[in-house]
């Protein structure tokens, strides 16, 4: 018997032992079931072996070709935002007991993790104005799709209405989920950048399980949710709001407006951009829908000595208890990202999130004024906005962004990528990190393009 060392790369002796175990004489014999015409008939072009030092240098040279936001000024948003993250956030989440912790199935040894998630749930509940929150979802898009399934389950209806002012990527994920649930997805066009209310009145009906709108919407505009809520509930459908958490520091919460479910992406709550993820989705709802919620829920209880403790609760909803009747088949969550959000919210506090929201609002409106004053760039929509707005130009947005990148600036999102009717329209985002000098420089560069 050959002694195999799992921490060493595979040796020829290891290879022989494995082939012998499965009854094969060679690698060629192992792969003979694969047609020769689709098999690589040459060695992989990996180059010569390298030492650790050489590998680090090679990979470092590749990494140097990238640019990060310590080198660039970002006016790009469209769902992911360059907010400031206090250094204490990363310091706390990097502690090994949080960073490497697994699912806290054993509460007696997981009280720290469970309490942290419980605090996260409490803060998201307060922020959204809802009654209950789960321990997190994969991202905002999956949270939205899970909310739609909740609505279908609760109403026993098979149609979801979603506004086209909802993030296009979120709508794609929604359609994928609903396709396999055999649920109809009806998209409503926008009218001047907001949900077309008259069209909503036409398409909503007795088979509508829910109406999904974004707040503020993908174009940065604040939708008239009061009117949408009235139309939705008149048909006994549910209102699902896809929300950006930072504006909730000063805007009315989904709970105050009358939403049944509030979902969103928690990237803005202390999570970096990370080349697209991982982020976290949050899902908050009413007490009435508690037992229909997907994912994990941490609850507060007392132990045999009467001391406060935390446990995973209402687990009969989950697939590891009863797969066929589970509220969803989500089998994990993003607890580390949720912890990040909790640390961020605890660090900045109620006044802090209001301050962040106000700075985003004020800087966006200052930028709107200076970027449109010459008339070269015109507003795409005439509606109230929060921290993002769209500008019309007579030039190709991709070409503008290419020139801005040469000047160390990440330009706006090209809306034509998702909306054919919005050719040469750029969506710009402004967070609390942007300065007057950076905005003025953006104006100067755009004016000469």
Swiss-Prot record:
InterPro entries assigned to the protein according to its UniProt record, in alphabetical order: GcvPA, GDC-P_N, GDC_P, PyrdxlP-dep_Trfase, PyrdxlP-dep_Trfase_major, PyrdxlP-dep_Trfase_small
Signal peptide coordinates: none
NCBIfam families: PRK00451.1
E.C. number(s) listed in UniProt: 1.4.4.2
Broad EC category: oxidoreductase
Subunit annotation: The glycine cleavage system is composed of four proteins: P, T, L and H. In this organism, the P 'protein' is a heterodimer of two subunits.
Xref: PANTHER family: GLYCINE CLEAVAGE SYSTEM P-PROTEIN, GLYCINE DEHYDROGENASE (DECARBOXYLATING)
Protein name, per record: Probable glycine dehydrogenase (decarboxylating) subunit 1
UniProtKB keywords: Oxidoreductase
Substrates-to-products reaction catalysed: N(6)-[(R)-lipoyl]-L-lysyl-[glycine-cleavage complex H protein] + glycine + H(+) = N(6)-[(R)-S(8)-aminomethyldihydrolipoyl]-L-lysyl-[glycine-cleavage complex H protein] + CO2
Superkingdom of origin organism: Bacteria
UniProt-recorded Gene Ontology molecular function terms: glycine dehydrogenase (decarboxylating) activity
Function of the protein: The glycine cleavage system catalyzes the degradation of glycine. The P protein binds the alpha-amino group of glycine through its pyridoxal phosphate cofactor; CO(2) is released and the remaining methylamine moiety is then transferred to the lipoamide cofactor of the H protein.
GO BP field: glycine decarboxylation via glycine cleavage system; nucleoside metabolic process
Family, similarity comment: Belongs to the GcvP family. N-terminal subunit subfamily.
UniProt-listed Pfam families: GDC-P
């Amino acid at each position: 018997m050959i002694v195999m060392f799992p921490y060493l790369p595979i040796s020829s002796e290891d290879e022989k032992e494995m082939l012998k175990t499965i009854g094969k004489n060679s690698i060629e014999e192992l792969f003979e079931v694969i047609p020769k015409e689709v098999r690589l008939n040459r060695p992989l072009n990996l180059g010569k072996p390298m030492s650790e030092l050489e590998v680090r240098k090679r990979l470092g040279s590749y990494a140097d070709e990238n640019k990060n936001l310590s080198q660039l000024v970002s006016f790009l948003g469209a769902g992911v935002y360059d907010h400031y993250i206090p250094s204490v956030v990363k310091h706390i989440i990097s502690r090994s007991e949080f960073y490497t912790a697994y699912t806290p199935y054993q509460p007696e040894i997981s009280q720290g993790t469970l309490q942290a998630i419980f605090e996260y749930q409490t803060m998201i509940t307060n922020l959204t104005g809802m009654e209950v929150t789960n321990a997190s979802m994969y991202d905002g898009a999956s949270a939205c799709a899970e909310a739609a399934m909740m609505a279908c389950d609760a109403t026993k209806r098979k149609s979801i209405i979603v506004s086209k002012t909802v993030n296009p990527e979120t709508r794609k994920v929604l359609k994928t989920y609903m396709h396999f649930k055999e649920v109809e997805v009806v998209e409503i066009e926008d009218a001047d950048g907001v949900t077309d209310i008259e069209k909503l009145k036409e398409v909503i009906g007795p088979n509508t399980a829910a109406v999904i709108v974004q707040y503020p919407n993908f174009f940065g505009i604040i939708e008239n949710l009061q009117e949408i809520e009235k139309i939705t509930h008149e048909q006994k459908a549910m209102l699902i709001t896809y929300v950006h958490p930072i504006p909730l520091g000063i805007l009315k919460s989904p709970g105050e407006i009358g939403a049944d479910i509030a979902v969103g992406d928690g990237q803005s709550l202390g999570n970096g951009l990370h080349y697209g993820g991982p982020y976290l989705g949050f899902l908050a709802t009413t007490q009435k829908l508690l037992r229909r919620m997907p994912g994990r829920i941490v609850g507060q209880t007392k132990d045999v000595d009467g001391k406060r403790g935390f446990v995973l609760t209402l687990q009969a909803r989950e697939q590891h208890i009863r797969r066929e009747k589970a509220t969803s088949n989500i089998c994990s969550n993003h607890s580390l990202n949720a912890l990040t959000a909790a640390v961020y919210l605890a660090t900045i506090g109620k006044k802090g999130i209001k301050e962040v929201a106000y700075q985003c609002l004020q800087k966006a409106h200052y930028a709107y004024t200076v970027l449109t004053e010459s008339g070269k760039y015109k507003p795409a929509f005439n509606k109230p906005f929060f921290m993002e707005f769209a500008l019309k130009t007579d030039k190709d947005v991709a070409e503008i962004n290419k020139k801005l990148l040469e000047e160390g600036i990440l330009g706006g999102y090209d809306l034509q990528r998702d909306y054919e009717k919005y050719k040469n329209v750029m969506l710009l985002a402004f967070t609390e990190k942007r300065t007057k000098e950076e905005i003025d420089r953006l104006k100067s560069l755009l004016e000469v393009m």
